[in-house]
Amino acid sequence: MDYLLQVKVGALVGLLLLTLFFGFIPARMKWFHVTGGTELHKAVLSFVSCFAGGVFLSACLLDIIPDYLSDIHGELQKRDLDDGFPLPEFIMACGFFTVLILEKMVLSCTEGHRNEETAPLLAPAAPNGHAHGHPSVNDLEGSGHHVHVDFHAHSSFRSFMLFLSLSLHSVFEGLAIGLQTTNAKVLEICIAILVHKSIIVFSLSVKLVQSAVKPLWVVLYVTVFAIMSPLGIGIGIVVIETERQAGGLIQAVLEGLAAGTFIYITFLEILPHELNSSERPLLKVLFLLCGFSIMAALCFLG
């Protein structure tokens, strides 16, 4: 096993264990059983989410997209497929729209069942920015995800569809790690994904606990969510390690889909969710710049 493969396997195991760790913290600590949390709790999650947004922004613009464009242009030139159509950018757009359409399908499905359930899954926001009724994930500013969910609506089908959507996000995130060809890039993207996933799984676990979901279901949801990024890493490793004539082109296309997913996560989830809030805007921008600057420095030094 070469060193790069060892690094990817280490990232796979580390991402799995740390995601499980952050997901199970709320289930074990009484502090998180208090509905609504504290202002300090919300502020810390919000600042960490902004930092993660900066990390993702830097990884997108300075590393993932440039490397993908270089790889895909090289593969297209080998096969004389460069006919003037912006195919590389189109592939990225496909990754972006795949995640967007998936999420909207899930939300439409839950909306279609709204009248059949006692409690709605998507809690409408009040004018002051807070939802009436049961708390939603949106109440935690640092959740890192913009899907506003009321887990007290205990339809097993709707809960499964929601976590399926989040889990597919994670598969594409892990895919970006598995497709990398250098140790530094694997570690850089792994850090970004780890910060992002930890915030999401932590916040979702808090709301599951506060909504009196059975402990067994909390464990199941957290475990399924945790294994999705490692699954994506494994798929990427298989693609890289499989020697076939079209392997380079397949790898480049998957890199483009993963890049589109990163664009979606950064620009439609983390940044709007945090920066649209009027609370502590300058501090949020500061944490955003810190995350971006650290990853930019790593790119420069690497």
From Swiss-Prot:
Q: Which UniProt keywords apply?
A: Cell membrane, Endoplasmic reticulum, Ion transport, Membrane, Transmembrane, Transmembrane helix, Transport, Zinc, Zinc transport
- Membrane topology classification: Multi-pass membrane protein
Where does it sit, as one GO cellular component term?
A: endoplasmic reticulum membrane
Reactions catalysed, semicolon-separated, are: Zn(2+)(in) = Zn(2+)(out)
| Regions that span the bilayer | 7-27, 45-65, 87-107, 159-179, 186-206, 220-240, 248-268, 282-302
Single Gene Ontology BP term?
Answer: zinc ion transport
Q: Where in the cell is it found?
A: Cell membrane; Endoplasmic reticulum membrane
Query: GO molecular-function annotation terms?
Result: zinc ion binding; zinc ion transmembrane transporter activity
Stretches in topological domain Extracellular? 1-6, 66-86, 180-185, 241-247
Q: Which Pfam families match?
A: Zip (PF02535)
Describe, from its UniProt entry, the tissues in which this protein is expressed.
Answer: Ubiquitous. Highest levels in ovary, high levels in heart, eye, kidney and brain, moderate levels in intestine and low levels in gill and skin.
Q: What is its main location?
A: membrane
Question: Taxonomically, which superkingdom?
Answer: Eukaryota
Positions on the Cytoplasmic side per record topology: 28-44, 108-158, 207-219, 269-281
Spell out the family assignment given in the record's similarity comment: Belongs to the ZIP transporter (TC 2.A.5) family.
Name the job this protein performs: Transporter for the divalent cation Zn(2+). Mediates the influx of Zn(2+) into cells from extracellular space.
UniProt protein name:
Zinc transporter ZIP1
Annotated source species: Danio rerio
Gene that this polypeptide is encoded by: slc39a1
